């Protein structure tokens, strides 16, 4: 079997909900990191790209009708380059990278752009059609996140808990205390603040320039979601999201955000032909399914399955990027895997609680950040894993070259 190499990875800053990137359409946002890859790799014959595989969780608004193809065209890729959009909700862009790697390892492709985009600020309200003339049963749904147009049969079978409710379920089932969740969130904020102060994320971010009606364009070059001023005392004052006495709060959960990320993946032949630098090898990936009501726990079985598949151990992982959808689910996973709550390998530069979680882009962000951390620390293996709504988990391992 052939190898699949990551040769470049870049992302936009992650914007706050209704923040600096809210003025940018999802398809335009998705084009930005692709265009950056084109600019950063001038030796590549871009007409020879075999595919663009982009993740996106919503696809109900400006990201409809194959946003991957739209972003590819807007980025300036030749029309001959095909593109597709995949949807595994939160795991979409990590799935896109895994799909690209499989195609290259199988010899079906040599050069693929994989990544994802999400504009949660611009997620539309939608309304279904009436089933009869002059119907009055239509309901307006907010597509920002979570369920819409719920199937009553699925509801009866598995329930349709909101994402915060699933985190509360995990906290209760696995005994994750509020204080531990807040400590985890605080650590995430502190690690991100330290990384930002050192300029750590600058090398993985392409600035977004937003024209204004009057005056100079606004340039967004820094993640907007982190709150360096977060304190444990402040977190303790927040009320539960699901219920007043609940443990899941806005402070120990990820954000609602906007962003995009793209990764250039190449075969041995493409690396040689275009004189590219192979930075990491994609070793293996996997997905699992669990009960939807505790979807946040899914990374634990996904990681166990993947390590067995790759014949590796958790001790061999130098970097572990575990998406922080909620502190409750992240802690349930790390504890099940036998990791300490403050393991320095887990999200060493903070995670989604601080950086934000634009659903379809987050997986590619994990890989981008993990790659840079491996190179900075001299580590060998990085593990990236995410929980996924409706009860799934995904995991992927890369090896620094």
From Swiss-Prot:
S-S bridge residues: none
Catalytic residue list: 90 (acyl-thioester intermediate), 357 (proton acceptor), 387 (proton acceptor)
Pfam families according to UniProt: Thiolase_C, Thiolase_N
Keywords on record: Acyltransferase, Aromatic hydrocarbons catabolism, Transferase
Highest taxon of the lineage: Bacteria
Catalyzed reaction equations: succinyl-CoA + acetyl-CoA = 3-oxoadipyl-CoA + CoA
Function: Catalyzes thiolytic cleavage of beta-ketoadipyl-CoA to succinyl-CoA and acetyl-CoA.
Homology family: Belongs to the thiolase-like superfamily. Thiolase family.
Protein name, UniProt field: Beta-ketoadipyl-CoA thiolase
Upper lineage: Bacteria, Pseudomonadati, Pseudomonadota, Gammaproteobacteria, Moraxellales
Gene name of the encoded protein: pcaF
